[in-house]
Amino acid sequence: MKKTQTWIITCIYLQLLLFNPLVKTKEICGNPVTDNVKDITKLVANLPNDYMITLNYVAGMDVLPSHCWLRDMVIQLSLSLTTLLDKFSNISEGLSNYSIIDKLGKIVDDLVLCMEENAPKNIKESPKRPETRSFTPEEFFSIFNRSIDAFKDFMVASDTSDCVLSSTLGPEKDSRVSVTKPFMLPPVAASSLRNDSSSSNRKAAKAPEDSGLQWTAMALPALISLVIGFAFGALYWKKKQSSLTRAVENIQINEEDNEISMLQQKEREFQEV
């Protein structure tokens, strides 16, 4: 029994060793965005429309490429969600909201780690810092969804343009983020929200090709590890069957020897009588 478990564990670890490194070479940091984002609809419905959520908004989010503001934005979203979570006690009345916010916070925390590990280098950044603003739940989670959408684009194609506001662009007309379209939930943040259309078009053109390469990189090592796993399984089964066959033959031989010994013993006893 112990030998069987040892072989099974060995095969599993071998497949993991073959599969993980090859996939990680193609993926940036996996996909931390889970289906929990679908619960945003319920959360927004539970919160009062006039409830204000404080967020350090990254200036230039509407005019700069997403890689310029994504890293700072996910950090600020993480801080705001943590503050929001503290306002809901973990009791039956607020358990639903507490659970949803906690799950969304974990998603953003994973995005922060990913962006820290894969932040673009040698990029001239904008000197503007995040500005403290207050948003309704609908506005806040519109920004949340847009950041999620920008992260998905970042996974398939990383832009490297400088993050400096053009001198021809005037200051924002309002200190609040304008919400001109109805609140959209996953799939999040339509591409029309991006003013940098040339960057979006390049990403859209590269997305199918990069997605195909990514799936190929995932499927190929999985197939190889599956074949190797079956091969090890077949070898183990063959060895096990051979051992079982020899064991059965040995049992039969022992039984025959015992029967012969018993017959000889009875024959000697009969002769003595």
UniProtKB/Swiss-Prot annotation:
UniProt-listed GO biological process terms: apoptotic process; cell adhesion; cell population proliferation; ectopic germ cell programmed cell death; embryonic hemopoiesis; extrinsic apoptotic signaling pathway in absence of ligand; germ cell development; hematopoietic progenitor cell differentiation
Q: Give the start-end ranges of region Disordered.
A: 190-210
What Pfam families does the database record attribute to this sequence? Answer: SCF
The UniProt regions of compositional bias labelled Low complexity, in chain numbering, are 191-202
Q: Which InterPro entries match?
A: 4_helix_cytokine-like_core, SCF
| Function, as annotated | Ligand for the receptor-type protein-tyrosine kinase KIT. Plays an essential role in the regulation of cell survival and proliferation, hematopoiesis, stem cell maintenance, gametogenesis, mast cell development, migration and function, and in melanogenesis. KITLG/SCF binding can activate several signaling pathways. Promotes phosphorylation of PIK3R1, the regulatory subunit of phosphatidylinositol 3-kinase, and subsequent activation of the kinase AKT1. KITLG/SCF and KIT also transmit signals via GRB2 and activation of RAS, RAF1 and the MAP kinases MAPK1/ERK2 and/or MAPK3/ERK1.
User: What name is this protein filed under?
Assistant: Kit ligand
**Source organism phylogeny:** Eukaryota, Metazoa, Chordata, Craniata, Vertebrata
